UniProtKB/Swiss-Prot annotation:
Residues covered by the BRCT domain: 637-715
Ligand binding (Zn(2+)): C435, C438, C453, C459
An annotated GO BP: DNA repair
Entry's EC annotation: 6.5.1.2
Lineage: Bacteria, Pseudomonadati, Pseudomonadota, Alphaproteobacteria, Hyphomicrobiales
GO CC, alphabetical: cytosol
Superkingdom per UniProt: Bacteria
Keywords, sorted A to Z: DNA damage, DNA repair, DNA replication, Ligase, Magnesium, Manganese, Metal-binding, NAD, Zinc
This protein's name: DNA ligase
The organism of origin for this protein: Rhodopseudomonas palustris (strain BisA53)
Positions contributing to NAD(+) binding: D47, A48, D49, Y50, D51, S96, L97, E129, R152, E189, K306, K330
Gene3D superfamilies: 5' to 3' exonuclease, C-terminal subdomain, 6.20.10.30, BRCT domain, DNA ligase/mRNA capping enzyme, Helix hairpin bin, Nucleic acid-binding proteins
Function: DNA ligase that catalyzes the formation of phosphodiester linkages between 5'-phosphoryl and 3'-hydroxyl groups in double-stranded DNA using NAD as a coenzyme and as the energy source for the reaction. It is essential for DNA replication and repair of damaged DNA.
Length: 715
């Protein structure tokens, strides 16, 4: 199958319909990265790449303001609080900042401020402060006493880390001075000194534990510990620089003077903060602090500019997720050159082949870097995700002198090649066409930049996740065999492929499951009974359980209904796989598959790729040898009373489970939806029905009880 790079269209060329789809894609990607950064303290992309995603989203929303929704990343901050900590509602939201990446954008920011305030030629004073790369924190004081500390979370709701925060020496338990409000939220950044970070990582390595990636991650991970003693043992620091709720009037009238008040109240305020009276002053500060960045004892990733007068801040207010009176001027990423010694391919849990650069050790921004991401095969060739040349088309080869960048001090990446230092014997890198772990052929779908292993059922790199999928609720759903059991059995080498689940009983004389902690003869007997009960399985569940890319529950049901039986399905798939060529697939079996309503090219190609890998077929044949029966698909009744109708089930159903209700409705030709809209025909409401029932009544959608639904479908 021929592959091509996914083209990202210019915003100016987007239609409204395409813009809506692109906004959805960007929102999902940004949400995933927000969760990694704010909840997991493990960012997956550089600041520069993340900022690029947000800028594209904001450009599209600027062109199509009618597409902006309350759920857009431009309207919210961070990620929802992680499980495990109590939730805290911020009295005043902890918003994020807009970004500037050039001197011109800083000048434009000040121009906007002047226009909004109608200042004419007057230049507003600006407070410039280093942007600390740490974890934002809000501290609530009542009658001067610290009563609660919370992380930013999603900006509205954070995590309660009060007990941990009380161990930080930089945070006063009682405010000092005589102008203390009845209640206030004081804010700042938890961080770790570079020297303390290096010492902590040395201890981690000596203890055989994984080192932290950077000071920001170590600070966030140290603060968000369940064991307060661990937090207390970590050298965490805190700079105060802002406030949220403040009962009564603030004791000062400017940002700069309020920082002085915070200092007198007992907080540490960054001594580098400077009051600027022009754009030039602000940019001089930016360049000076940038030059001193490496020598600073803590990590920073830019400079924050804030309008000094608080009454002007109040007038300027907010625009979406960010204040109009402040902006972050980001630094360019730190870089260094070194030798690319090797390119290795890592295979992820979903089969994605990711190239990793193994480098001669080099210090970038104070951190020794030996590995860096190469993203994908197009990136190595010098082609961007939009199909346009990268690095003026320069490819990356083993032996090259390469430029390494730590953008935002997160994941190092190879950003360019020094061509005049390229060895004479360096050859273009050939990306593997087979999985380096299992040997299955690796394919790249049209429009994608990632090449994936097709050995879904047999690849060790994917095994655990595939097996978890195999036993999931919509697949084989084996009672007593969940994710933890799969991890345990796989770790011990007992279950490597799906068929191994069904041979556990015959192998148990050797395995002795009953001797495992938490198991006994009764629990093992029950597990084997549950496995035996699944030796008879519905065709759509089996298809879903195979873990074929793009084949979710809905597509599995479409395939099952079309082919009817396992024999017909397998025969068609083998015929379609046999007709596959580099130029495409013109076999009758493939055309039949491609023409199934709701399937289409992408799904059809993914299914054929799965069956083109002979070892997948062998693994499936072995599994079928252990099953008693694969039940034929129930045929949909096109003439039922609910055929073609959209139905939503809500509340607690007493006469059938939600899955049974859904299956019955689909057999009768109905579409089961998860939410109520104007297109919904029926809402079947059980006990304790909530918001869906309310919305149905508001929209005038027909609401049925269980008995009324049964009467309708039984006709």
């Amino acid at each position: 199958m021929k592959s091509k790079s996914k083209t990202v269209p210019d915003v100016a060329t987007l239609t409204k319909a395409k813009a809506k789809v692109e906004l959805m894609r960007l929102a999902l990607e940004i949400e995933r990265h927000d969760k990694a950064y704010y909840q997991e303290d493990a960012p997956k992309v550089s600041d520069a790449d993340y900022d690029a995603l947000r800028r594209r989203l904001e450009e599209i929303e600027h062109k199509f303001p009618e597409l902006v929704s309350g759920a857009s990343p431009s309207q919210k901050v961070g990620a929802a609080p992680a499980r495990g900590f109590a939730k805290v509602q911020h009295a005043v939201p902890m918003l994020s900042l807009g970004n500037a990446f050039s001197d011109d954008e800083v000048a434009e920011f000040l121009q906007r401020v002047r226009r909004f305030l109608n200042l004419g030629d007057e230049i507003p004073a600006i407070v410039a402060e280093p942007k600390i790369d740490g974890l934002s924190l809000s501290l609530r004081y009542e009658q001067g006493e610290l009563v609660r500390a919370a992380t930013r979370g999603d900006g509205s709701v954070g995590e309660d880390v009060t007990a941990n925060v009380r161990t930080l020496k930089d945070i006063p338990h009682t405010l000092k001075g005589n102008r203390i409000p009845a209640a206030c939220e004081l804010r700042g950044e938890v961080y770790m000194l570079k020297s303390d970070f290096l010492a902590l990582n040395k201890k981690q390595e000596e203890a055989g534990e994984a080192p932290f990636a950077n000071p920001r991650n170590s600070a966030a991970g140290s603060l968000r510990q369940k064991d307060v003693a661990i937090t207390a043992s970590r050298p965490l620091k805190f700079f105060a620089y802002a406030w949220g709720e403040f009962s009564g009037e603030t004791p000062e009238r400017t940002q700069h003077d309020m920082l002085g008040w915070l200092d007198h109240a007992g907080f540490v305020v960054n001594p580098e903060i400077t009051l600027c009276h022009s754009v030039d002053d602000a940019l001089v500060f930016y360049r000076r602090i940038g030059e001193e960045r490496a020598a600073l004892p803590y990590d920073i990733d830019g400079v924050v500019y804030k309008v000094d007068r608080l009454d002007w801040q109040a007038r300027l207010g907010f625009a979406g997720r960010a204040p109009r009176w402040a902006i972050a001027h980001k630094f360019a990423a730190e870089q260094a050159t070194t030798i690319l010694e090797k390119i290795e391919i890592q295979v992820g849990r979903t089969g994605a082949l990711t190239p990793v650069a193994r480098l001669a050790p080099v210090t970038v921004g104070g951190v020794v870097v030996q590995n860096a991401t190469l993203h994908n095969e197009d990136y190595i060739k010098g082609v961007g995700n939009d199909g346009q040349p990268l690095r003026e088309g320069r490819d990356i080869r083993v032996g090259d002198t390469v430029i390494i960048q730590r953008a935002g001090d997160v994941i190092p990446q190879v950003v360019d090649v020094v061509l005049d230092k390229r060895p004479a014997d360096a050859v273009p890198y050939e990306f593997p066409q087979a999985c380096p772990v299992c040997g299955s052929h690796a394919v790249r779908e049209d429009g994608e930049v990632v090449r994936r292993c097709t050995g879904a059922l047999i690849c060790p790199a994917q095994a655990v996740e595939r097996l978890k999928h195999f036993v999931s609720r919509l697949a084989f759903d084996i009672d007593g065999l969940g994710e933890k059991q799969i991890e345990l059995f796989h770790e011990r080498g007992w279950v490597k492929e799906p068929v191994d689940i069904f041979t556990l009983k015959t192998r148990n004389a050797t395995l002795k499951l009953e001797e495992l902690e938490g198991y006994g003869e009764t629990s093992v007997r029950n597990l084997f009974a549950a496995i035996d009960a699944r030796r008879t399985i519905e065709l759509h569940r089996l298809i879903f359980a195979l873990g074929i890319r793009h084949v979710g529950e809905g597509n599995a049901k479409l395939l099952a209904r079309h082919y009817g039986t396992i024999d017909a399905f397998l025969g068609a798939m083998r015929a379609a796989a046999a007709g596959q060529t580099e130029e495409g697939n013109t076999s009758e079996a493939y055309q039949d598959l491609d023409n199934i309503g709701g399937i289409g090219d992408i799904v059809a190609e993914a299914v054929v790729e799965f069956f083109a890998e002979e070892r997948n077929v062998e693994a499936l044949d072995a599994l079928l040898g252990e099953l008693d029966e694969v039940l034929p698909a129930a045929q949909v009744k096109r003439d039922s009373a609910v055929a073609g109708k959209t139905v939503v089930f809500t509340g607690s159903l007493s006469k059938f489970t939600r899955d049974e209700a859904k299956a019955a409705a689909e057999r009768l030709g109905a579409k089961v939806a998860g939410s109520v809209s104007k297109k919904t025909d029926f809402v079947v409401a059980g006990e304790d029905a909530g918001s869906k029932l309310t919305k149905a009544r508001e929209l005038g959608v027909s609401v049925l009880s269980e008995d009324e639904w049964l009467a309708l479908i039984q006709g």
